From Swiss-Prot:
UniProt cross-references to PROSITE patterns, sorted A to Z: RIBOSOMAL_L11 (PS00359)
Protein name per UniProt: Large ribosomal subunit protein uL11
Organism for this UniProt entry: Pseudomonas putida (strain ATCC 47054 / DSM 6125 / CFBP 8728 / NCIMB 11950 / KT2440)
Lineage, top ranks: Bacteria, Pseudomonadati, Pseudomonadota, Gammaproteobacteria, Pseudomonadales
GO cellular component, one term: cytosolic large ribosomal subunit
NCBIfam families the UniProt entry points to: L11_bact (TIGR01632)
Length: 143
């Protein structure tokens, strides 16, 4: 018989840097999950990713206090800011442009995000990422 699911916890944790401090500790502690076990497993799974990039994770907590988790790819906004060399997007994206990204950069981001996107092919994924870039106040070249 399958285990009974108690809760789903969604967090963004920096790759390779999970530790028991907030937000990880309180979120897992209130469901009775072994926090250090999660931190070690998460850090091991995200070892190949660039350290410090926020990684969305969905933790499934079962009634016997065991857990499983699934990591997603880094949010597109973080990858776009990194590609454009910015610390934040524009406060007024339709009037004030703060940077530029090229189609090649968008293709790299789309390839990294393709597993999490619902796009049918790479070109559709690039257009999706380009829309995110425009909404952040970035100029998009070549799309």
């Amino acid at each position: 018989m399958a285990k009974k699911i108690q809760a789903y916890i969604k967090l963004q944790v920096k790759a390779g840097q999970a530790n028991p401090s907030p937000p990880v500790g309180p979120a897992l502690g209130q469901h009775g999950v072994n926090i250090m076990e999660f931190c070690k497993a998460f850090n091991a799974r995200t070892q190949g990713q660039e350290a410090g990039l926020p990684t969305p994770v969905i933790i499934t907590v079962y009634s016997d206090r065991s857990f499983t988790f699934e990591t997603k790819s880094t949010p597109a906004s973080v990858l776009l800011k990194k590609a454009a060399g910015l610390t934040s997007g524009s406060a007024r994206p339709n009037t004030v442009k703060v940077g530029t990204v090229t189609r090649a950069q968008l293709e790299d981001i789309a390839k990294a995000k393709q597993a999490d996107l619902t796009a049918a092919d790479l070109d559709a994924a690039v257009r999706t990422i380009a829309g995110s870039a425009r909404s952040m106040g970035l100029n998009v070249e070549g799309v």
